[in-house]
Amino acid sequence: MCCAIWSASRAPACSASQLSSSHAVRPSVVPDANPRAAPRYSPDLRIQCTSGTPRPCGSSPLAIVTSRETARATTPSAVPNGASVSNSPCATAASTGAGALDPPVRSSISNSRRGPTSGSVRGRPRCSSSVRSAAASACSRASACIGARCHTVTNEVAPPSSASATRIAPAVTGSGSPSADSCTAPPSSTADARAPRSADSAAVCGQPRRLTLCRCARPSASRASSQAAATPGSSNSGARGSGRSVITSHASRPLIASSPTVQRNQTTVHQQTCEGPTCVQRSVTRLTAMSNPSHAEVPSAYPPPADFAANANATGELYAEAEKDRLAFWEKQAKRLSWQTPFTDVLDWSDAPFAKWFVGGKINVAYNCVDRHVEAGNGDRVAIHWEGEPVGDARSITYAELKDEVCKAANALTDLGLVAGDRVAIYMPMIPEAIVAMLACARLGVMHSVVFAGFSASALRARIEDAEAKLVITSDGQYRRGKAASLKEAVDEAVADQPSVKNVLVVRRTGIDVKWTDGRDLWWDETVEQASTEHIPAAFDSEQPLFLLYTSGTTGKPKGIVHTSGGYLTQSSYTHWNVFDVKPESDVYWCTADIGWVTGHTYIVYGPLSNGVTQVVYEGTPTSPTEHRHFEVIEKYGVTIYYTAPTLIRTFMKLGHQIPASHDLSSLRLLGSVGEPINPEAWRWYREHIGGGKTPIVDTWWQTETGAIMISPLPGVTAAKPGSAMTPLPGISAKIVDDEGNQLVPGADEAEHVTGYLVLDQPWPAMLRGIWGDPQRFKDTYWSRFAEQGWYFAGDGARYDSDGHIWVLGRIDDVMNVSGHRISTAEVESALVGHAGVAEAAVVGASDDTTGQAICAFVILKASAHGGPENMIEELRAEVAREISPIAKPREIHIVPELPKTRSGKIMRRLLRDVAEGRELGDTSTLVDPSVFEAIRASK
């Protein structure tokens, strides 16, 4: 016999440590610690001992007893299938009315395992002495549980051919409680007398008590969907053809809320026990880890909550408006901004692919982001809640204060000789001065080139040299994981012998010693802080270049993407307003990106500030000083909108849901994902454990080159599908085509997915205007693939689902061709991560003499993964075959301790491909930890 404490996963949220430390009940053997050692379908008995008086979290123990011997003692030997038999009087919870099993569960367990079957048993089931003994033993070991009422649940795991979700609730007598001594078996009819009934039953032994119990049995391996009966006050829903279901509690919260590949290995019991007006509610989740798991049903789409939709900034009419007249639509969006000189034409596409938007208009970007909000009377509104990495290092800056800082910086830059059209390199951590520097440049018509502060001196040098920057703005150092690291040192190396650089402006951030070059180097506080707060912004042409942002190129030389003023700000402001449904008067928005990337430019600086929003800017890493840091920040500022990357979401998944569960995240009302396609499991985990099971998620697709979001759900309109970017935003035109440019048609969900190329077939306001100094490279890179049609080639593979929604699969070089089948690395990675034992996965294609390309996978396992590496590899191959196709089974699966990632969190698949094909590694300078390849090679 084994005894253990199980904690509730819902309110009251008692942790296992809380319960066990309070009552000194220690498991000698964890139940099902080795599920492979037990017969797969053998029943077990769980006896839940709760104290007679409901008490708060941590004071009421929950003892779980499992015993193979006890289970065998309660297995019927001469009774019909499905009858729960015992040897002493008890009250079965499923007796009449609501207690009827609905629908019946049909089991294919052979009679030799269940005993002979004939007829129907009615009358009084009996509890065996071994059951009573086990209960007494368990309860006696929990001192606070002595004299408790013991609720027994006999559960038999159904074989693969059965698929059901059953609800068991007690019959209620006139007094509202079942009788302890008069109980009946579940009613049956002549028509179903021969049908095997569920072995699930609930018995209440002891004092009368009202008991509500829900259990979701696993559906079949064939994914036949099942209907869950609904108890009063609860609801259930299923996804078409996906073999998934959700059973919700009385509070309409999913009991099964993570992905099907996790839930398929779990049995969840949600129990509410009431005495008079007082109720105790708890959920118990029991891992079964079956060797051939099937999939639970979960919704395939998640519509927005009714109250969210009713108050959303964007409605479905926005699509119709844009469809009716696309240019008139963009004209209306541009007029949300303040133009010193109105534009005369919306678009000039005569020199395609070089676009001109809002022709003739003049605008100042910084004025639109700062001054106009102050002039509108919102100067006291907080623009930035800045949180430094060292705990306690924080400050809040209002729009009026931000305006003063930007004006001072603009005056200082003017004094240094900068004029419109010059370039400034910004190499800084996430501190307010970085945003001030960007806005000061925009105010002057000076192009800023922000370089991620994690890049090396050589990478910085290449960008300074290409842009011919006159000024570099940096800081003495930055904080990373609690330590101060130098930045000025890298700048000194990068600007050595650079004739274009006249000055280096340095912010004091960490106080570390730095080398100093007199005549070139200047302290920010001595230069900017002394300048005047009065500055009149000049208006610039709509096509005035706003910034350069370098992105990686296939040739190895970074591409300087050029974005201009009017079109970029129009789309940045429009998408931020509608995709994130921002309410400037009440929202606190947080985008976790770095300003060194385009997400930081558009959705930290220009989008939020143009809309007058209050936002959080955080300097440090998500796990410094602890893995709770992000959630502490959300709590501290009452963040309502949270926009982050799938990489970080998967990091949180590996840390465990108990981390976000220990914080009050109820302020969150919208979540966003950016940077790469998000796998459905991470999407559902994100919604359930960070969004409280209710927040809409906007999965956004866009690029450095597009400047702003292009494909995304509208949160108040779209029933979002986990893993899908859904449809182009109003005003955006995108399609998926084959090699010849023919548009693909929506395919059946269960059929083999047909992958095509994602293209943009109409110009858009925030589109890049070129590659700095290389117009031919601009044409060759983005417009030559479908030059005849005049389409922008995004470089991403994508597919349509049966509803015509877009699923972006990643870079086209991440689409493998295996025996003529085009298979996305993202699809295979999603299938692998869907396994309950996998924390993270990366997939690449490697050359293969037979199939052209073969699939190679690199997998990080969870600490809780069962079985040895060889067994796990076979399980994962089978998982991919089941989820996608046998043709997609990886040729190689390597279990590794870590994956190679850049400082922006992206997996370097190019280097994994080098490993898979046995080549020497390419450049590893952008990796966080190049030494990870030693462990990866050791795994081969």
Swiss-Prot record:
<feature type="compositionally biased region" description="Polar residues">
    <location>
        <begin position="258"/>
        <end position="274"/>
    </location>
</feature>
<feature type="region of interest" description="Acetyl-coenzyme A synthetase">
    <location>
        <begin position="290"/>
        <end position="940"/>
    </location>
</feature>
<feature type="binding site">
    <location>
        <position position="819"/>
    </location>
    <ligand>
        <name>CoA</name>
    </ligand>
</feature>
<dbReference type="InterPro" id="IPR032387">
    <property type="entry name" value="ACAS_N"/>
</dbReference>
<feature type="region of interest" description="Disordered">
    <location>
        <begin position="70"/>
        <end position="127"/>
    </location>
</feature>
<keyword id="KW-0547">Nucleotide-binding</keyword>
<feature type="compositionally biased region" description="Low complexity">
    <location>
        <begin position="184"/>
        <end position="202"/>
    </location>
</feature>
<feature type="compositionally biased region" description="Low complexity">
    <location>
        <begin position="224"/>
        <end position="245"/>
    </location>
</feature>
<dbReference type="GO" id="GO:0019427">
    <property type="term" value="P:acetyl-CoA biosynthetic process from acetate"/>
</dbReference>
<dbReference type="InterPro" id="IPR020845">
    <property type="entry name" value="AMP-binding_CS"/>
</dbReference>
<feature type="binding site">
    <location>
        <begin position="699"/>
        <end position="704"/>
    </location>
    <ligand>
        <name>ATP</name>
    </ligand>
</feature>
<dbReference type="Pfam" id="PF16177">
    <property type="entry name" value="ACAS_N"/>
</dbReference>
<dbReference type="GO" id="GO:0003987">
    <property type="term" value="F:acetate-CoA ligase activity"/>
</dbReference>
<feature type="binding site">
    <location>
        <position position="833"/>
    </location>
    <ligand>
        <name>Mg(2+)</name>
    </ligand>
</feature>
<dbReference type="Pfam" id="PF00501">
    <property type="entry name" value="AMP-binding"/>
</dbReference>
<feature type="binding site">
    <location>
        <position position="838"/>
    </location>
    <ligand>
        <name>Mg(2+)</name>
    </ligand>
</feature>
<keyword id="KW-0479">Metal-binding</keyword>
<feature type="binding site">
    <location>
        <position position="835"/>
    </location>
    <ligand>
        <name>Mg(2+)</name>
    </ligand>
</feature>
<feature type="modified residue" description="N6-acetyllysine">
    <location>
        <position position="906"/>
    </location>
</feature>
<keyword id="KW-0007">Acetylation</keyword>
<protein>
    <recommendedName>
        <fullName>Acetyl-coenzyme A synthetase</fullName>
        <ecNumber>6.2.1.1</ecNumber>
    </recommendedName>
</protein>
<comment type="similarity">
    <text>Belongs to the ATP-dependent AMP-binding enzyme family.</text>
</comment>
<dbReference type="InterPro" id="IPR042099">
    <property type="entry name" value="ANL_N_sf"/>
</dbReference>
<dbReference type="InterPro" id="IPR000873">
    <property type="entry name" value="AMP-dep_synth/lig_dom"/>
</dbReference>
<feature type="compositionally biased region" description="Polar residues">
    <location>
        <begin position="107"/>
        <end position="120"/>
    </location>
</feature>
<feature type="binding site">
    <location>
        <position position="599"/>
    </location>
    <ligand>
        <name>CoA</name>
    </ligand>
</feature>
<feature type="binding site">
    <location>
        <begin position="480"/>
        <end position="483"/>
    </location>
    <ligand>
        <name>CoA</name>
    </ligand>
</feature>
<comment type="function">
    <text>Catalyzes the conversion of acetate into acetyl-CoA (AcCoA), an essential intermediate at the junction of anabolic and catabolic pathways. AcsA undergoes a two-step reaction. In the first half reaction, AcsA combines acetate with ATP to form acetyl-adenylate (AcAMP) intermediate. In the second half reaction, it can then transfer the acetyl group from AcAMP to the sulfhydryl group of CoA, forming the product AcCoA.</text>
</comment>
<feature type="binding site">
    <location>
        <position position="822"/>
    </location>
    <ligand>
        <name>ATP</name>
    </ligand>
</feature>
<feature type="binding site">
    <location>
        <position position="811"/>
    </location>
    <ligand>
        <name>ATP</name>
    </ligand>
</feature>
<dbReference type="Pfam" id="PF13193">
    <property type="entry name" value="AMP-binding_C"/>
</dbReference>
<dbReference type="GO" id="GO:0016208">
    <property type="term" value="F:AMP binding"/>
</dbReference>
<dbReference type="InterPro" id="IPR025110">
    <property type="entry name" value="AMP-bd_C"/>
</dbReference>
<keyword id="KW-0460">Magnesium</keyword>
<feature type="region of interest" description="Disordered">
    <location>
        <begin position="224"/>
        <end position="274"/>
    </location>
</feature>
<feature type="region of interest" description="Disordered">
    <location>
        <begin position="157"/>
        <end position="202"/>
    </location>
</feature>
<keyword id="KW-0436">Ligase</keyword>
<dbReference type="InterPro" id="IPR045851">
    <property type="entry name" value="AMP-bd_C_sf"/>
</dbReference>
<feature type="compositionally biased region" description="Polar residues">
    <location>
        <begin position="72"/>
        <end position="95"/>
    </location>
</feature>
<keyword id="KW-0067">ATP-binding</keyword>
<dbReference type="InterPro" id="IPR011904">
    <property type="entry name" value="Ac_CoA_lig"/>
</dbReference>
<keyword id="KW-0732">Signal</keyword>
